[in-house]
Amino acid sequence: MSTRSRARKRSRVRSRTRRKDPIFVDGHRPRPMYVDYKDLELLSKMVNRQGRIMGRRKSGCTAASQHAVTAAIKRARFMALLPYVGE
């Protein structure tokens, strides 16, 4: 393998694009992180058809916002605003 092909392989490394958090797309995150448990439109997007909370990889949330979403979904379920089981 020549030096040229090694240099070419190194230059092909892709830069990672930062994904925007789907919960706070306007760029302003409230501190402390809080998601309203009465916002059923947002919470229903974070729950799959079976009623399970989607993971971070699938939802695209950061760790802090995923934790806030999980807490809000659990509160909404306790208040009977969201079902525990899906369809």
From Swiss-Prot:
Pfam families linked: Ribosomal_S18 (PF01084)
Assembly mode: Part of the 30S ribosomal subunit. Forms a tight heterodimer with protein bS6.
Protein name: Small ribosomal subunit protein bS18
MF annotations from Gene Ontology: small ribosomal subunit rRNA binding; structural constituent of ribosome
Organism: Rhodopirellula baltica (strain DSM 10527 / NCIMB 13988 / SH1)
InterPro entries per record: Ribosomal_bS18 (IPR001648), Ribosomal_bS18_sf (IPR036870)
GO biological process terms on file: translation
Annotated keywords: Ribonucleoprotein, Ribosomal protein, RNA-binding, rRNA-binding
Sequence ranges of Basic residues compositional bias: 1-19
Keyword set includes NAD: no
Gene Ontology CC annotations of this record: cytosolic small ribosomal subunit
Family: Belongs to the bacterial ribosomal protein bS18 family.
Keyword Nucleus in annotation: no
Function statement: Binds as a heterodimer with protein bS6 to the central domain of the 16S rRNA, where it helps stabilize the platform of the 30S subunit.
Sequence segments annotated as region (Disordered): 1-25
Top-rank lineage group of the source organism: Bacteria
